[in-house]
């Protein structure tokens, strides 16, 4: 089980990313727009740098919903590999069967 502080930090990052997403998209559009003046684009770049670091969605890490484990997490289920195995063996994931060939 991951420390609770790390799990809460990830939740905070997700909240910040959602909160600043429109502002970040607007600034990036200005930066990429070649028709804008160089000063406008530069000021937009400076303003983008002033946003909180954790508002960048690339800083978010996928974690297991049950244990908070940061590695070996399957996006489709939102669970770590070992928890998927436990739950799948109990038959609690519909349509998931053990592979055999």
UniProtKB/Swiss-Prot annotation:
Record flagged with keyword rRNA-binding: yes
GO cellular component, one term: cytoplasm
Pfam families found in the cross-reference section: Ribosomal_S14
GO molecular function ontology, one term from the record: rRNA binding
GO process terms (BP): translation
Keywords: Ribonucleoprotein, Ribosomal protein, RNA-binding, rRNA-binding
HAMAP family per record: Ribosomal_uS14_1
Function: Binds 16S rRNA, required for the assembly of 30S particles and may also be responsible for determining the conformation of the 16S rRNA at the A site.
NCBIfam families per record: PRK08881.1 (NF006477)
Family the entry assigns: Belongs to the universal ribosomal protein uS14 family.
Subunit structure of this chain's protein: Part of the 30S ribosomal subunit. Contacts proteins S3 and S10.
Protein name per UniProt: Small ribosomal subunit protein uS14
Species, as recorded: Paraburkholderia phymatum (strain DSM 17167 / CIP 108236 / LMG 21445 / STM815)
Lineage, highest ranks first: Bacteria, Pseudomonadati, Pseudomonadota, Betaproteobacteria, Burkholderiales
């Amino acid at each position: 089980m991951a420390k609770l502080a790390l799990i809460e930090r990830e939740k905070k990052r997700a909240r910040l990313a959602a909160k600043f997403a429109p502002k970040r998209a607007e600034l990036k559009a200005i930066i990429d727009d070649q028709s804008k003046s160089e000063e406008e684009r530069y000021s937009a770049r400076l303003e983008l740098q002033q946003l909180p670091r954790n508002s960048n969605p690339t800083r978010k890490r996928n974690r297991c919903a049950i244990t908070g484990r940061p590695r070996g997490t399957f996006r489709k289920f939102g669970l770590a590999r070992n928890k998927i195995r436990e739950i799948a063996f109990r038959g609690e994931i519909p349509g998931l069967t053990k592979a055999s060939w």
